[in-house]
Curated annotation (Swiss-Prot):
Start-end of Basic and acidic residues biased regions: 113-145
Protein name per its UniProtKB record: Large ribosomal subunit protein uL24
Keywords, ordered alphabetically: Ribonucleoprotein, Ribosomal protein, RNA-binding, rRNA-binding
Family of this protein: Belongs to the universal ribosomal protein uL24 family.
GO CC list: large ribosomal subunit
Sequence segments annotated as region (Disordered): 108-145
Subunit organization: Part of the 50S ribosomal subunit.
Role, per record: One of two assembly initiator proteins, it binds directly to the 5'-end of the 23S rRNA, where it nucleates assembly of the 50S subunit.
InterPro entries, sorted: KOW, Rib_uL2_dom2, Ribosomal_uL24_CS, Ribosomal_uL24_euk/arc, Ribosomal_uL24_KOW, Translation_prot_SH3-like_sf
Record gene name: rpl24
Amino acid sequence: MYDKLNVALSKDLRKKYGIRSFPIVKGDVVKVVSGARKGEGGKVAEVDHHSGLVIVEGITIAKIDGKQKGFGISPEKLQITHLDLSRSERFQKIKELANIKHITIQEEPIQEEQQKTEETKQEIAPEEVEAKEAQDKQEVKENDQ
């Protein structure tokens, strides 16, 4: 039983945050750096703390009945290429660790993403969306005739 599974960070992330490894969670993007699956990568689908393995989307193994099953990979064979900082406590921990090395980190990426989505929602009013859908339907009918 493992409490947290630490995984090495890519060189870009090491330089950006000043740390070598960080606990992996569902949503991080990883790359396999050794073993038979070297070079493959994807988003973390599941972290099995009981067996100490990480299951990555897109990396599967065939079962005897022909179905595909997620393939568990040991954390020491992985490298994090993109951190999922959607949880504020995780971002705060990164910020604290970077602060030790006197590295300043920009404003929370979550807030930036939320601002962008709010701006796009404000730009497109519901009436405009309905009008555009009606116009598209008319064009399809005209093309069919």
